[in-house]
Amino acid sequence: MRMLRHLLLPMLLLAAAFCFAKDKSKDRFLQPGPIHIDKAGQKWADKTLRKMSPEEKVGQLFGIRVNAQFLNDADPIWLQLRDNLDKYHIGSLVMSVPVDGAVLLKSPPDVAAELLNRLQKSSKLPLIVAADFERGASMRLTGTTVFPHAMAFGATGKTENAEVFGRISALEARAIGVHWNFFPDADVNSNPANPIINTRSFGEDPKQVGDFVAAYIKGAHEAGMLTTAKHFPGHGDTATDSHLGLAQVTGDRARLDTVELPPFRRAIEAGVDAVMVAHVTIPALDSEANQVATTSTSIVTGLLKEDMRFKGIVVTDALDMAGLTRLYMKDIGRAAVESFKAGNDVLIMPGDLDASYRSVLQAVQSGEISRQRLDQSVRKILELKASLGLNKARLADPGQLSIEVAKPENVATGQRIADEAITLVRDNGKVIPLQSFTSPGTAGAGLPYQSLTEANNRLVVVILSEDLRTDSGRMLERQILARAPNARVMYVDARSAAGMTPAVVEAVQAAEHVIAAVYVVPTAGRAIRAAGGGLKNSVAMNDSTGSLLTAILDHAASRTMVLAMGNPYLVQDFPAIENYACAFSNVSVSETAAVKAIFGEIPITGHLPVTIPGIASRGEGLERPVRSSSAQPISGGSSHVQP
């Protein structure tokens, strides 16, 4: 008996150690490194796949949305998330943020990391966490390095900017617990009326777009981030937002081969990890009526996997977008089934998770989807997880946040890129840089909301915002008042434009210099232009703010510098614009860059990465040197006017 006890004790200890080891990944911090699957990772993927039930395999296909926010353990949102992971055997998360109208309710990175770690611990298998970090983590979180929109990178003409952007974004994302970026955007923005791509694209030239795409992939891979080329086979030549309706690419196959597809081929050559398929119809590739690329076997399997020989992960765009859901109103679950049958591996953000999961599972059980086809995709997903090291450790190390996120040198890099992007298209009034002058009256800080009669009107700044609840214009105002404390800053949006027009017109009539900063950026799922409106741009100003800008130009066109803090094409709607500069983005670094350029503190060296029909061709841009050091800044008191 004693001998038996001596034999049993080591065996029990070994068994206990083995059981403990199986769960160690839930308690270990994942150290980001090269994306590579080793023998142990391959063995884990094979073993895990063999043990999985059909229900678990189907669950691995789905990526569900999680908003980065603090959640109490008893919060219904947390309980639903936790239960969904278990009930549907979810394979991936798509990190986003809560939205209140036009306002993104962003959280700091530590809140996001803590929530993602809790979800990782709650999941039987490690989760891949994806995000739309098109402008880096700052697109979804506060306190991170800010980068401008992709088109700003195109305006710099320097692919090395995209590479360093990829590296910094990856370092910050991995520190937070995000492994997979739905970027770079490989769309060629060849249609100025495109309502959803616009400044999200690097430009209109297929080669330039491809070069920037490849550079971003290289940088992101250096810091261990999975990348995604989107929106296959091209969303740049559409005139409809696929979040709102059915978009169509009308070009023939020859045009697709020379314009839309080259950046995706370049991405594949660069080793992109995933390709995201768009909810767009392309008659030249699939002539079936209302057949979107997402559910087209000819496009996903025939073109992407076979003709272009892409071996990585194929992921859908969000399945809750109207461009897809309107085609499956009677049976929303079929959208997921048809997407998977077409060749997609990962199905993200279904409009109805339960219906989508059950529909795919039923299709597997009935034989409509073969077990072999299911295993192919699940194996790719498991191998992707192992290539990240998630089989060994799955938690983000909170200690890395203060090391990797918002490093001063990285913040400076984001600002430098925004500076280099500023593009001067017109300067007929010779207003750049602003000439020095001395403001009359008493210098010093004025009270906010002063009446017009009390304020100094030598420099008037009109911020034409899409919604005053957003941060648009705040950094621009701070930077201008730091240089010209007596400037009058007036905020206007669609709801206030009509009432503010008399006051704005009175101010600009008396002003020596006027800056009109126009904030218009492509925003998913929001109709920007009112039906029947007179403006022809799809990413355009609201008619009321457009009318106000027209009034400003009627009274002070030669003295007004119009800043495009987003869509560069909007100048088409206002032929009276005499002075025009593009920042290509509404983020804080672009606001700072625009002010620095106006005051001559930085050279203006950007060149248009797109053609503005009837205005300027791609590659054009007026260059300006730094202002002479002998010039003096504008001085005086401050005034801030809001409705």
Placement of each model-derived feature along the sequence:
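Short acidic, glycine-rich surface-loop motifs adjacent to enzyme active sites
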Residues: 84-106, 192-193, 268-291, 316, ...
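Solvent-exposed loop/turn segments at secondary-structure junctions
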Residues: 67-71, 99-102, 134-138, 186-190, ...
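Preference for extracellular/luminal or secreted protein segments
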Residues: 22-83, 297, 306, 327-643
